[in-house]
A protein has these predicted regions:
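Gly/His-enriched, cation/cofactor- and phosphate-binding structural elements
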Residues: 139, 152-153, 162, 326-328, ...
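Hydrophobic alpha-helix feature that most strongly marks membrane-spanning transmembrane helices
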Residues: 11, 15, 26, 42, ...
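Conserved "right-hand" nucleotidyltransferase catalytic core of DNA-directed polymerases
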Residues: 1-5, 9-136, 146-153, 160-163, ...
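Conserved catalytic core of nucleic-acid polymerases
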Residues: 101, 107-109, 113-116, 192-326, ...
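Conserved, non-catalytic sequence blocks in retroelement Pol enzymes and Pol-derived host proteins
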Residues: 31, 179-181, 301
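Flexible glycine/proline-rich, aromatic-decorated loop/lid segments
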Residues: 133-140, 182-189, 283-285
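Conserved catalytic alpha/beta cores of large enzymes that bind or transform nucleotide phosphates
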Residues: 142-167, 178-211
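C-terminal polymerase-core module
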Residues: 16-19, 23-77, 246-298, 344-383
Length: 383
């Protein structure tokens, strides 16, 4: 029933967006044709002075290009919304009912251990790890995931800032470790350091920039990449990154050490000793070498976080079986575990689950994993 309601709402929204976009254009055209869309946006409407082009000479209309133009014209925003709504409809709203197994009446995703090079689990048929939570349509889809019946509720147990905690632990950076030990908002704490202001004077835009840098550093973000994401000059982005490393010197030392060690060994390791071969780190090709260096930085962090949650899953599964619990672990979404929780077991099981998640893999330098939990009548409400 909820799926039918979502399907109708999404179809109505897509139709409304289609009509509005074509009114802006002043004529009918195929919204799904990059060539036609580019010609209207940049050839006819001339929304940008010097629009980017592909190697074949067509105007670029990919998500990154259009996202960088968001707010310049209502049509751009509506096209981005149209694309997201269309993707959600085809990927989830229309497709999920086809994945319901007749014998159980449930959707059963497939997990793969050898798809992501860092060791993260991947989900397919259907992919339940990629349902957006920041959009209204994505939230509606999450509402469709409910417990098995009366007496049950959904429990979401989510590692808090796990990759940044792993980076603090592996780098041994005193400032970052201190922020976590004091249970500070790490993005607010980083903003206070980078902008040299007291914690209570950090503005929302400062925190937003710090958040982008915190996560970007894990993936080896460049000054150019940060400037593109924040819409600021490259020189300003470079200054922010440099200040970040001045405030967190242990992070820079860790990254330099990891790259040097990987060049020497040809591989990088997670906290559990799981290795990823990175022979390209000594390549004479700058682009290939750069990609390998970013992987060398990211793999120990993301890979150790992946090891942590998989070890937690093993411990929790064994615990639930031994306890004869009616509660079942039903889904893993990177840093989150979802349970079909029997209400009578909530008081005993939730603390036990949290403890096993926190203790699954001891982190160096006194850094502790933190787990946030929530329950609800559906997956959305559990957050």
């Amino acid at each position: 029933r909820r799926q039918r309601q979502m399907c109708i709402r999404d179809r109505v929204r897509i139709d409304a967006l289609t009509t509005s976009i074509k009114e802006h254009a002043g004529r009918d055209f195929n919204l799904n044709s990059p060539t036609q869309l580019g010609e209207i946006l940049f050839g006819e409407m001339k929304l940008v002075e010097k629009p980017k082009k592909t190697k074949t000479g067509q105007f670029k209309t990919d998500e990154q290009t259009l996202s960088s133009l968001a707010g310049k014209h209502p049509m751009i925003d509506e096209i981005l919304e149209y694309r997201e709504a269309s993707k959600l409809k085809s990927t989830y709203i229309d497709a999920l009912p086809e994945h319901v197994v007749s014998q159980t009446g449930r959707v059963h995703t497939h997990f793969h251990q050898l798809v992501a090079a860092t060791g993260r689990l991947a989900s397919t048929d259907p992919n339940l790890q990629n349902i957006p939570v920041r959009t209204e349509a994505g939230r509606e889809i999450r509402k469709a995931f409910v417990p098995r019946g009366d007496g049950f509720t959904l429990l979401a147990a989510d590692y808090s800032q796990v990759e940044l905690r792993v980076m603090a632990a592996m780098s041994g950076d005193k400032g970052m470790i201190e922020a976590f030990q004091q249970d500070l908002d790490i993005h607010q704490a980083t903003a206070a350091r980078v902008y040299d202001v007291p914690l209570d004077e950090v503005l929302p835009e400062m925190r937003s920039t710090a958040k982008m840098v915190n996560f970007g550093i894990i993936y080896g973000i460049s000054a150019f990449g940060l400037s593109q994401r924040l819409g600021i000059p490259r020189t300003e982005a470079a200054e922010i990154i440099e200040t970040y490393f001045e405030k967190y010197p242990g992070v820079r030392e860790f990254m330099d050490h990891i790259i040097d060690e990987t060049k020497e060994n040809g591989y990088v390791e997670t906290l559990t000793g799981r290795r990823r071969q990175l022979r390209d780190i000594t390549s004479s090709n700058q682009n290939i070498r750069g990609n390998a260096e970013r992987a060398a930085i990211n793999t120990p962090i993301q890979g150790s976080a992946a090891d942590l949650i998989k070890l937690a899953m093993i411990h929790i599964d064994a615990f639930l079986r031994e306890a004869g619990a009616r509660t079942k672990m039903i889904l893993q979404v990177h840093d989150e575990l979802v349970f079909d929780l029997h209400r009578d077991e909530e008081d005993d099981l939730v603390p036990a689950i949290v403890k096993r998640m926190q203790d699954a893999l001891p982190l160096p330098h006194g850094v502790h994993a933190k787990v946030d939990t929530g329950t609800g009548a559906n997956w959305l409400e559990a957050h």
